[in-house]
């Protein structure tokens, strides 16, 4: 199974922490090019449910499905739906969940997908084929909403300046290509030699917003909590601070005892649903970064499910919501 050339970021470390065993049932929540899936299937007798919302990734995995002799089920869906996907396959509990969140190298390298400011293509950015594109958001969102999106999801301190320029320019010519938007941001955000590309944060913000990536991640983590068996493992690789903060806070909350107090003994305590396997995030070594610069920002966190019930789901957030912005546009 391991003959494919694709090697995922922190692939060895992810599989070491997942620790797949013979006969176990696992979920690769973000199939992509199938790197984690191949490593899991290398363990004899494993059963794997792999998920991806990108139809191109699903098509690319057809050969692996055929070679797996019934051990791999590949499903086109959002990874936030992993509990429902498992239930549809007759699986109510699994031994491990691994997820590599964010945009994939394959998606970035395809100009037609519109993810990259370095390649000219349609301003799309959708991981799936449904919903508004980045061009739709840029065309319809108010200046205030655009500024919030770019600031909160891209951590761009010049967000208001960028939003103002977008709204001014779109009245003359709609933004339909990645190059047009990247050029505008490049004129508005000044950079020095050695800085990241001026459009990096704006493109990140629009991509996260269009795909609802932070909401997806939060929901996927709680879904994994529900389907993991006691002793089952959750492994998450993230690529920027917003994602890592969500994973870190989720695991910190789920790995501590909460709710009770010696002053209020009648308040029931919530037992930890996870035990941390990584007190600090695992990062890529120098050799991996040299071969794959994208690995520089990767952080891996892992935890093991306890026998305690899943915690109450709290989905509150302060992020701009796609449905709200597009409804008001």
UniProtKB/Swiss-Prot annotation:
Its EC number is 2.1.1.199. Pfam families: Methyltransf_5 (PF01795). Coiled coil: none annotated. InterPro entries: RsmH, SAM-dep_MeTrfase_MraW_recog, SAM-dependent_MTases_sf. The keyword rRNA processing applies. Signal peptide: none annotated. It is found in: Cytoplasm. Keywords: Cytoplasm, Methyltransferase, rRNA processing, S-adenosyl-L-methionine, Transferase. It is an enzyme of class 2 (transferase). One of its GO terms (molecular function) is rRNA (cytosine-N4-)-methyltransferase activity. Gene3D superfamilies: Putative methyltransferase TM0872, insert domain (1.10.150.170), Vaccinia Virus protein VP39 (3.40.50.150). One of its GO terms (cellular component) is cytoplasm. Residues 285-329 are annotated as: Disordered. It catalyses: cytidine(1402) in 16S rRNA + S-adenosyl-L-methionine = N(4)-methylcytidine(1402) in 16S rRNA + S-adenosyl-L-homocysteine + H(+). S-adenosyl-L-methionine binds at residues 34-36, 52, 79, 100, 107. Its main location: cytoplasm. GO terms for biological process: rRNA base methylation. PANTHER family: 12S RRNA N4-METHYLCYTIDINE METHYLTRANSFERASE (PTHR11265:SF0), S-ADENOSYL-METHYLTRANSFERASE MRAW (PTHR11265). Specifically methylates the N4 position of cytidine in position 1402 (C1402) of 16S rRNA. Belongs to the methyltransferase superfamily. RsmH family. This is Ribosomal RNA small subunit methyltransferase H. It comes from Bradyrhizobium diazoefficiens (strain JCM 10833 / BCRC 13528 / IAM 13628 / NBRC 14792 / USDA 110). The gene is rsmH.
């Amino acid at each position: 199974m391991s003959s494919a050339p694709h090697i995922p970021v922190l692939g060895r470390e992810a599989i070491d922490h997942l620790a797949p065993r013979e006969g176990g049932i696992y979920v690769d929540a973000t199939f992509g090019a199938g790197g984690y899936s191949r490593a899991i299937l290398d363990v004899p007798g494993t059963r794997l449910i792999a998920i991806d919302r990108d139809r191109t990734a699903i098509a690319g995995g057809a050969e692996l499905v055929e070679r797996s002799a019934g051990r791999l089920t590949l499903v086109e869906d959002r990874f936030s739906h992993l509990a429902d996907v498992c239930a549809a396959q007759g699986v109510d509990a699994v031994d491990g969940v691994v997820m590599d969140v964010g945009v994939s190298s394959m998606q970035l390298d395809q100009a037609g997908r519109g993810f990259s400011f370095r390649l000219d293509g349609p301003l799309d950015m959708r991981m799936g084929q449904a919903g508004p594109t980045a061009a739709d958001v840029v065309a319809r969102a108010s200046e205030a909403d655009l500024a919030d999106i770019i600031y909160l999801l891209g951590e761009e301190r010049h967000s208001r300046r960028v939003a103002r320029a977008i709204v001014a320019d779109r009245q003359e010519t709609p933004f339909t290509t990645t190059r047009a938007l990247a050029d505008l941001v490049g004129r508005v955000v000044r950079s020095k030699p050695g800085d990241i590309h001026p459009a990096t944060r704006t493109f990140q913000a629009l991509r996260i917003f269009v795909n609802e990536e932070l909401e997806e991640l939060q929901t996927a983590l709680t879904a994994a909590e529900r389907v993991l068996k006691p002793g089952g493992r959750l492994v998450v690789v993230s690529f920027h601070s917003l994602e890592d903060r969500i994973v870190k806070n989720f695991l910190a909350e789920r790995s501590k005892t909460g709710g009770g107090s010696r002053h209020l003994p009648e308040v029931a305590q919530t037992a930890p649903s996870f035990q941390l396997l990584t007190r600090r995030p695992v990062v890529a070594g120098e050799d991996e970064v040299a071969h794959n610069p994208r690995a520089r920002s990767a952080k891996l966190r892992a935890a093991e499910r306890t026998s305690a019930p899943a915690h109450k789901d709290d989905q509150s957030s302060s992020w701009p919501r796609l449905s709200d912005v597009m409804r008001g546009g």
